[in-house]
Amino acid sequence: MKLKIIKSLTLIGTLLFSFSALALKNDTQQPINITSDNQSLDLENNIVTFSDNVVITQGSILINADKVTIIRPADNGGGKEKIEALGNPVTFQQELDNGKPINGKASKVNYDLGSEYLILTGNAQLKQLDSQIDAEVITYDVKQQKMIAKNSGKGRVKTILYPSQLQQK
């Protein structure tokens, strides 16, 4: 029982892995702080749920959501955690190694640690300084560092780029 609790609590640490490819190098070494009005742990199904006014911080990373659920596969066969954040909207911000801030928001954010795919769904937006991408769905492959933005037939993907912000400094 004690071992299951310890294993389940380590799920919390996985929540911010989705942003580690973008964050300051030392962000992932910082403590993870999670506050919420309610927290629950389902040991049998390996699910940790944080609900109502969820605030997560780690270094320069700040995530706000209405509900965050972390699911660890029941088998020990090397399966990876899946994370889902819901909000109106879910918001996140962080500072990159180049000193530029990045902000994002969506109704739902999913991250699969196994495939290393981050999916923002529902009025999704990624913004860096004044440049931004708006779409119904934004998918980011963390390993390949590739992004796909798409809409479901209604409307179009919108991108705003400022040439001065694209230049390396």
Which residues does each PLM region occupy?
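Mature-chain termini and adjacent capping regions
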Residues: M1-K169
